[in-house]
Amino acid sequence: PGRVDIDLRPAIVEAKARVGDWELDTIVGPMGLRGALVSMVDRCSKLVRLSLVPSRQATLVADAIATRLGEHPERVLTLTMDNGLEFARHRNFGAALGADTYFAKPYQSWQRGLNEHSNGLVRQYFPKATDFSTVTAEDVRRVELLLNSRPRAALGYFTPLEVFHGTSAKPSVALAS
């Protein structure tokens, strides 16, 4: 209930012209194993935030999103996710962050293409066979730092950290204030 279709997002979100528009997903291990990663990617800076959760239960996922993105609430404007049950509490974390929430159409993962690409980068460190119940928060932070410190061609060879924190700006980037 209360899901807003991705087609209703403001045009500026599609333009990737400002920091603060996030794509959300979860990364899981093999069937039957507990634990998951919540992945959050800023569309403009490509900054990745990862949070380890013991399961994809909606309450745990909502708390993880509110906590990690709540570190910089001024840089959270919109949240776009798939229709997974783990995002059932979107109203809660959207309200906690003061952000509008949007949902991709079912079976159209390309509508959150940056997030899917970023999940592939995360999989370089945590392959599909990973049992996330054995992964530590320190492991997750290390991978997050590696990804966010990697210069990107799409960012003029600046890093996601540099663009997100405004120490350098990709051309025509507007930082959320």
Stretches found by the model and what they are:
Residues 25, 40, 46, 65, ...:
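Mobile genetic element proteins and their domesticated derivatives, centered on retroelements
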Residues 81-83, 88-94, 102-124, 133-145:
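RNase H-like two-metal-ion nuclease catalytic core shared by retroviral integrases
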Residues 1-37:
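Mobile-element integrase/transposase regions
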Residues 125-177:
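C-terminal domain-tail junction helix/linker
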Residues 28-33, 50-74:
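Active-site beta-loop-alpha junctions of metal-dependent nucleic acid enzymes
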Residues 46-51, 103, 128:
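Short small-residue beta-strand/loop micro-motif enriched in glycine and branched aliphatics
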